[in-house]
């Protein structure tokens, strides 16, 4: 099928363009430039972030579907009109007027104007400077730099979320990028090869106007729908379900932890490691617990009804945990903690929500869940810039001290290599899950900064035997996908670019290193390097520049999804389902399935903060 829809309206079409809102956005940008939102008192900082978000919604949402497409995916609802009240497997029919919006197989959008994305050449991707040189000289971890305010479940959770949000798909073996290597480079292959991102199968080269930027598709659903637990197709979903009481299969149910079909073995998928396996197991169990609860409340519901309602509840619980627990843990500035809680409960707060429910239609007063659906005049998708700023591999440790929750005794000293791929199965067979979770909860992750990239991931052997330097790959990917370099990225977000290497970072040694690698040209500094180098706001584990994309996209994932907005109702979720979301946190989920963690979590307000170490006063 060919898609030649008329161009979508830009966000600039009128969203909050009245004089009072122009004053709000103008004052917000002035205060941010002159003082910084993070240095303002919390109430003024919140107002500034509100104004910045309005401006980002006006200027930084851009629809790649304006470029003509062919062979676009077809929405295929399953049972009659069940898609009206259930999430479809592929994400179609979330928007009832544009059923293809956000479904698996549709294009990534952009947070920068399409006309600002120049055509990408091989020289752009492979030189100025070589991605491998950037990896070795600026990203290599010499000594682990911890993020001391959080625990390593932060890293596991992020990858768990990423598996839901986006994937460019399996790279083709043909035409790899060939990266030349220096004579002293220990890489065992000459030259280094990095597989290309798959082309956009919906691209129509004859109809696309000359000079339009490359596009790519998301093989996952763009929606926050827990597709990493439930799959992105009817076929995947059927394979995961037991067919009884709405429940999912758990690893080990039939004596085998994974499907016998090697093509469906998740341990053979690149990027699979213990942290991801633990989160997938935990929330498959949570789905089944929700099914049990709903079955007691509504005994007449059949397998299909229980599954669909539990999926809605589980997906919303994941979104809530990410919004009010994970993100405040990694950006624990008082202003951002309040802002994130406001996204979910509004300024009225959690207590008012629990007592009275929504007291206003405004998302600012009563939060986004239950408010009106709003795409801000641009069809919803995740974006290539969102993908780029979520490249946070430094969160992952290289060395793991696995210990018992009961007494903190050593069970195993392991490296990341021991906890990745098929090796995960051996670990899960020999160490109880509560001890693995305890170990993660009492170990710090890495800080997202220069010289802190996991060594194992710089010499990563994929399940297919292909060697990969993920640090070099991260640099190359942003270039390949047309994501601007650091200074231009900041300009397009209306932020001041770095005038010098010393202005980019307050670390003098880093400034000299970056200057040397980039030949003294500040404009060439890659986005990832700039994000990792800049000074962090108080309480942040990642950069303020990346945070600007989160200001925009974190709320958009909720605002655009009718199952978080107009359909976030007792009629769709059930009263018991909404209560489950309200009453649960990451901590209650952990304790429901692993009560042996009670002492470790005692007094811990946020399960992503460091846990209690057994035997320590």
Question: Can you name each region flagged by the protein language model?
Answer:
Residues 493-497, 518:
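Alpha-helix capping/termination and helix-coil
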Residues 480, 495, 503-504:
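Folded extracytoplasmic luminal domains of secretory or organellar precursors
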Residues 500-517:
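Short linear, low-complexity motifs centered on an aromatic residue
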Residues 1-289, 293, 309-472, 476, ...:
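N-terminal accessory/cap region of cofactor-dependent oxidoreductases and related radical enzymes
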Residues 296-298:
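Metallocofactor- and cofactor-centric catalytic cores in central/energy metabolism, strongly enriched
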């Amino acid at each position: 099928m060919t898609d030649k829809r008329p161009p979508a309206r830009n966000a600039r079409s009128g969203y909050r363009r009245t004089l009072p809102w122009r004053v709000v956005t103008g004052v917000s940008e002035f205060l941010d430039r002159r003082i910084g939102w993070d240095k303002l008192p919390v109430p003024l900082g919140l107002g500034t972030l509100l104004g910045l978000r309005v401006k980002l919604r006006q200027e930084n949402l851009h629809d790649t579907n304006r470029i003509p497409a062919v062979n676009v995916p077809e929405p295929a609802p399953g049972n009659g009109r069940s898609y009206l009240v259930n999430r479809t497997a592929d994400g179609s029919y979330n928007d009832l007027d544009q059923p293809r919006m956000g479904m698996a197989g549709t294009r990534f959008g952009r947070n920068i104007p399409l006309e600002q994305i120049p055509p990408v050449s091989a020289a752009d991707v492979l030189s100025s400077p070589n991605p491998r040189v950037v990896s070795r000289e600026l990203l290599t971890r010499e000594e682990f730099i911890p993020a001391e305010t959080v625990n390593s479940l932060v890293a596991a959770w992020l990858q768990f979320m990423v598996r839901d949000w986006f994937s460019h798909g399996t790279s083709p073996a043909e035409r790899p990028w060939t990266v030349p290597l220096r004579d002293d480079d220990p890489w065992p292959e000459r030259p280094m090869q990095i597989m290309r991102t798959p082309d956009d199968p919906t691209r129509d080269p004859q109809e696309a106007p000359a000079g339009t930027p490359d596009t790519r598709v998301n093989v996952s659903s763009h929606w926050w729908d827990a597709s990493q637990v439930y799959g992105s197709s009817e076929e995947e979903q059927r394979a995961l379900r037991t067919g009884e009481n709405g429940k999912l299969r758990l690893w080990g149910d039939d004596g085998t932890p994974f499907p016998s079909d090697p093509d469906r073995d998740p341990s053979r998928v690149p990027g699979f490691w213990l942290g991801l396996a633990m989160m997938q197991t935990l929330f498959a169990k949570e789905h089944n617990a929700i099914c049990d609860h709903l079955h007691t409340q509504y005994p007449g519901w059949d397998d299909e009804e229980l599954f669909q309602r539990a999926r809605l509840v589980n997906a919303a619980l994941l979104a809530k945990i990410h919004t009010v627990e994970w993100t405040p843990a990694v950006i624990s500035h008082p202003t951002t903690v309040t802002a994130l809680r406001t996204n979910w409960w509004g300024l009225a707060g959690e207590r008012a929500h629990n007592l009275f429910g929504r007291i206003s239609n405004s998302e600012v007063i009563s939060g986004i869940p239950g408010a009106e659906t709003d795409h801000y005049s641009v069809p919803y998708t995740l974006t290539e810039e969102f993908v780029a700023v979520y490249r946070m591999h430094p969160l992952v440790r290289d060395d793991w001290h696995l210990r018992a929750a009961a007494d903190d005794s050593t069970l195993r000293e392991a490296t990341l290599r021991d906890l990745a791929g098929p090796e995960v199965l051996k670990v899960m067979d020999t160490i109880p899950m509560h001890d693995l979770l305890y170990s993660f909860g009492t170990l710090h992750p890495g800080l997202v900064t220069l010289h802190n990239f996991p060594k194992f991931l710089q010499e990563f052997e994929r399940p297919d035997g292909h060697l990969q330097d993920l640090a070099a790959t991260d640099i190359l990917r942003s270039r390949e996908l047309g994501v601007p370099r650091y200074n231009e990225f900041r300009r397009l977000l209306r932020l001041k670019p770095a005038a010098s290497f010393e202005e980019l970072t307050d670390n003098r040694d880093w400034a000299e290193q970056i200057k040397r690698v980039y030949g003294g040209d500040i404009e060439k500094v890659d986005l990832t390097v700039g994000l990792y180098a800049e000074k962090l706001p108080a309480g942040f584990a990642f950069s303020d520049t990346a945070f600007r994309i989160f200001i925009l996209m974190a709320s958009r994932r909720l605002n655009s999804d009718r199952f978080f907005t107009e359909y976030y109702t007792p009629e769709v979720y059930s009263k018991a389902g909404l209560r489950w979301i309200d009453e649960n946190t990451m901590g209650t989920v952990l304790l429901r399935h692993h009560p042996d963690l009670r002492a470790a979590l005692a007094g811990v307000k946020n399960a992503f903060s460091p846990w209690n170490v057994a035997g320590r006063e």
